[in-house]
Amino acid sequence: FSAQPTSVRWIGNERGIAGDPVWHKVKKAKITDDVKNEYLNHGDPEGDMYSVGEADVSIRSGWFYHDNQQPKSIKDLMDIYFKSVGRGTPLLLNIPPNKEGKFADADVARLKEFRATLDQMYATDFAKGATVTASSTRKNHLYQAGNLTDGKDDTSWALSNDAKTGEFTVDLGQKRRFDVVELKEDIAKGQR
């Protein structure tokens, strides 16, 4: 990354943590050699250019391989995932090769565990096809509340044009136990 404005920016830390909130816009004039990390971490809702904040972190405590280091725990990786991808930023996870130019067995095992944990987390969508009611809906069938649970990435719900806030309720049909809720913003229509 550089001090020049680009469509992808460093998130401002090497812990893999995006700001909350994080905006995918910045003001071109602020991206200079002395830009503040806090500004990079959050972006700017009034920015004049699109610039995705990319969260980067190493699977180990440093960027290079050392025999005496172990990969981060699955708990730590999941925390990083929720504080990067969960906040709408891509995660660049560094895997340093060992002195033979290969990935360490412990790192490969942790990556597989990480993938399996993510797959398990997203395996069951209790809300898919569930009934949804909303406080407001745009008068266009393209943005109906039922789109929230249709399982499609190319549909979305939108408030009526005059609404500033809104809410929706998803009826799962029965009691369900879960610990993760995934909400996606229709970025094609702008970040809000």
Q: Model regions: which residues?
A:
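Short, surface-exposed beta-strand/strand-loop-strand elements in extracellular ectodomains
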Residues: G190-R192
